[in-house]
């Protein structure tokens, strides 16, 4: 009703980031609905200064995750760099998407992380576009 709810939860970084990935993936899956008219596939090669990252997405309903990125440091901006993999894995499986992420090259860990997140956003945006030429879902089986 009229009250405010506030809950402070002290949870480790790993579980917090993983839970955020699960929540985002679930929200993406629910927002896509039956996927009628969706382009389904999207990719982005994104430069961030000296870094180049690649992301490819298939919203076909079969979760799979490929990740190829390494970092010089254990943390970046207060986040454990290993948690990027955990986040994207959780998004991929919760959204039921095939997700490939690769940092082709780069030196600065911040640029690598930022390029991966932005490439993912751009690839997802491309895959979720609707095309009037697509009748139903883009699948030879007729279902995703």
Regions found by a protein language model. Name each.
Residues 42-45, 54-56, 88-91:
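A generic local secondary-structure boundary/capping motif
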Residues 68-75, 133-144:
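Solvent-exposed, glycine/polar-rich loop segments of beta-barrel outer-membrane systems
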Residues 53-65:
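Short beta-strand elements
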Residues 36-52, 136-144:
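Glycine/charge-rich, flexible interdomain linkers and switch-proximal surface loops
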Residues 62, 66-67, 76-131:
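Mixed-charge, glycine-accented linear interaction segment located at domain edges/termini
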Residues 7-15:
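N-terminal auxiliary interaction/assembly segments of multi-subunit proteins
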Residues 18-39:
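Ordered, amphipathic secondary-structure segments that act as subunit-interaction surfaces
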Residues 1-6:
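Short, small-residue-biased leader/transition segments that mark boundaries at the very start
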């Amino acid at each position: 009703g009229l009250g405010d709810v506030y809950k402070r939860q002290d949870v480790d970084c790993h579980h917090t980031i993983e839970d955020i990935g699960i929540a985002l993936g679930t929200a993406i899956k629910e927002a896509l609905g039956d996927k009628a008219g969706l382009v389904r596939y999207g990719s982005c090669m994104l430069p961030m200064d000296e870094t180049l990252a690649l992301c490819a997405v298939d919203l076909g309903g079969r979760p799979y995750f490929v990740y190829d990125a390494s970092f010089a440091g254990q943390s970046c901006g207060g986040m454990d760099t290993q948690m990027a993999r955990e986040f994207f894995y959780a998004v991929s499986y919760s959204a039921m998407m095939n997700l490939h992420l690769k940092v082709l090259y780069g030196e600065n860990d911040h640029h690598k992380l930022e390029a991966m997140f932005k490439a993912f956003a751009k690839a997802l945006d491309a895959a979720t576009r609707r095309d009037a030429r697509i009748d139903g879902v883009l699948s030879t089986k007729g279902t995703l």
